[in-house]
Amino acid sequence: RQLLMLVVLIGTILSKGLNAFQQTFITLEIELIEAKLDKKGNRDLANIKKVTTFGYTPLIKKSFEVLISKENLVTDLSSKSASKVLSKSAASELRNFVLKDLNVIGQTVSFEFLTNSWIDGYLKGRVTRGSIKNSKNVSPEQLDLVDQLVELGIIKKKCNLGFLLGSDASDMRPEAAGFGVSMVGSFYMLLVVLILSIRIGV
């Protein structure tokens, strides 16, 4: 009986927890316009760093306009409303990508963004159309758009390495949360305790 209970417990943990190791991503073609990101055109890192996430947001919105037109998607959403299916960390992710390799400026790149937690929940079955009737976070029109993007393979669920390696996230972007940094901190704390314990014991 104890073995059976253990099997049930492990099965429950796996069935409830495996979704955490998958996250929903959307792949967009982003034109990294030089005039927006490097006005002087000299690839000076200090100057490019002055472009905040607000400077990257219009590039993401523009990519949605291009996508909707290119794929003939049926939606009444503006590019601003459509881009809200992305995580609030999207502009920051794109900015970090550019700062790591300034040579991408002026190119059109294929970039994977996290969707927001509501879209992720919808594709994992936690969020339904019925449950969002009075929600300000997601609309039926956005879910219609998501369904079309899933059919096209533009939105997919993939292994969430960020969950294993990332740091904690704010309430505004829970989809970007991870426990990697916490694990490192816990490891060093245990190491310190172990060292102190050995010295005191000796």
Where are these regions (language model features)?
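Transmembrane alpha-helix signature in integral membrane proteins
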Residues: 179-202
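N-terminal signal-anchor/first transmembrane alpha helix
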Residues: 1-12
